[in-house]
A protein has these predicted regions:
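Sec-dependent N-terminal signal peptides
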Residues: 4-14
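Phosphate-group recognition and catalysis centered on beta-loop-alpha active-site segments
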Residues: 16-164
């Protein structure tokens, strides 16, 4: 009897997994694990998986653009050992990631995300708050997007204070 109840209990417990409308599903670094993290391909995969929101990380390049990447150094996912904050967007765009993918800017990511999906932008590097705020204000004024489309997070309290 015990052997019969265990599978029935599991079936009952997991049969309701798709019926949880109040749970928010967020793709971490896009759809990390399905596509290379923080790339356009990863964000598109997260959209295909019907997430409610997507989390990405940003650093500011030497030339001032916000770059979507998790680490300060490019070494983990490319052949470059450069640090994002020390090189220009032109140089970053010439760097090839694993699988021949490229490193996107924050604008490129925002441009492909549907209105119904929110974006959690993690401020990873120094001096990212002001540029992120400026980009969000631009999108809010030029589109139908609302402030609830964007969430700002960071371990860098100084950047969060600047954002306010």
């Amino acid at each position: 009897m015990k052997k019969l109840l265990s599978p029935l209990l599991l079936i009952f417990l997991f049969s309701n997994c798709n019926n949880t409308p109040d749970v928010i599903v967020i793709g971490h670094r896009g759809a990390m694990g399905h596509a290379l993290e923080n790339t356009i391909e990863s964000v598109e995969k997260a959209i295909d998986l019907k997430v409610d929101g997507i989390e990405i990380d940003v650093f500011k390049s030497k030339s001032g653009e916000l770059i979507v990447y998790h680490d300060p150094s490019l070494s983990r996912l490319s052949n470059s050992t450069a640090f994002i904050e020390q090189i220009s967007l032109d140089s970053i765009k010439k760097i090839e990631l694993i699988g021949g993918l490229s490193i996107p800017t924050l604008n490129e990511v925002i441009d492909i995300i549907p209105e119904k999906i929110f974006l959690n932008i993690e401020l990873k590097g120094e001096n990212t708050a002001y540029e992120t705020n400026k980009i969000i204000i631009k999108y809010l004024s030029e589109s139908n997007l609302t402030p609830s489309k964007f969430i700002i997070s960071s371990f860098r309290w100084d950047e969060l204070k600047k954002f306010r």
